[in-house]
């Protein structure tokens, strides 16, 4: 499986056993100025999240695309 990774402009091959791609988003103290924080990566199962955190999981190559906004 290949998934997009945080801080990379190219998808990466996931480690053996990690066949799920995920996109996790949440707000921090800078959310109103910078937008939501984003984490992209691979996992063996869809990660569990806390309140206020959104996660999307998928199981095809490079399915964890995220449209980053333009800096202000």
From Swiss-Prot:
Disulfide bonds join 3-21, 14-42, 27-31, 46-57, 58-63. One of its GO terms (cellular component) is extracellular region. Expressed by the venom gland. It holds the Pfam family Toxin_cobra-type. Belongs to the three-finger toxin family. Long-chain subfamily. Type II alpha-neurotoxin sub-subfamily. Keywords: Acetylcholine receptor inhibiting toxin, Disulfide bond, Ion channel impairing toxin, Neurotoxin, Postsynaptic neurotoxin, Secreted, Toxin. It is found in: Secreted. The keyword Nucleotide-binding does not apply. GO terms for molecular function: acetylcholine receptor inhibitor activity; ion channel regulator activity; toxin activity. InterPro entries: Snake_3FTx (IPR003571), Snake_toxin-like_sf (IPR045860), Snake_toxin_con_site (IPR018354), Toxin_cobra-type (IPR054131). It comes from Dendroaspis polylepis polylepis. This is Alpha-elapitoxin-Dpp2a. Binds with high affinity to muscular (alpha-1/CHRNA1) and neuronal (alpha-7/CHRNA7) nicotinic acetylcholine receptor (nAChR) and inhibits acetylcholine from binding to the receptor, thereby impairing neuromuscular and neuronal transmission. It comes from the Eukaryota.
